[in-house]
């Protein structure tokens, strides 16, 4: 759960955010940032720039289940997407969390893969790290 730009958002890694009423906690529905959300998924652990208030996010399997596509985006405190970056990961993997510095985004691709009709099957050989210049 995050409160951002006047909205309470429930976050789950393999879906878009859901808006909720901050008083009643009633679910209002999918929130796509007024049509700006470029990815089918949204991290459950966005990071916030303490100097600017900007929210840094990503979506893995961003074009659908089992795809290696990852989409990173920055959102201004007023809810405007300021940067969108697409990349293809070395494998379709779950990205549980990430770290952000002034110059870098660091991800750990969890050792899970699609196999035998199982969406996420543990595979230690798939453990990878990726560092991107922010």
For every predicted segment, state its role.
Residues 62, 111-133:
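Short, conserved, GDST-rich strand-edge loop motifs in beta-rich repeat architectures
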Residues 73, 82, 86, 106, ...:
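Leucine-rich repeat
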Residues 31, 85-88:
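Short hydrophobic alpha-helix segments
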Residues 44-45, 95-100:
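Beta-rich, blade/repeat-based domains predominating
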Residues 40, 90-92:
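Short loop/turn positions that demarcate and connect the beta-strands within blades
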Residues 102-103, 132-134:
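Conduit-forming functional cores of very large proteins
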Residues 10, 105-107:
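Short hydrophobic-aromatic micro-motifs
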């Amino acid at each position: 759960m995050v409160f951002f730009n006047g909205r309470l958002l429930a976050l789950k890694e393999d879906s878009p955010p859901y808006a909720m009423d901050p008083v009643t906690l009633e679910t209002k529905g999918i929130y796509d940032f007024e049509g700006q959300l470029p990815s089918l998924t949204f991290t459950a652990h966005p990071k916030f720039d303490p100097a600017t208030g900007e929210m840094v996010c990503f979506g893995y399997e961003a074009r659908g289940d089992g795809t290696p596509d990852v989409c990173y985006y920055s959102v201004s405190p007023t809810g405007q997407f300021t940067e969108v970056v697409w990349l293809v990961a070395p494998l379709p993997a779950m990205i549980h969390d990430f770290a952000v510095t002034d110059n870098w985004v660091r991800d750990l691709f969890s050792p899970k893969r699609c196999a035998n009709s199982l969406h996420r099957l543990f595979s230690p050989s798939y453990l990878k790290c990726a560092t991107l210049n922010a």
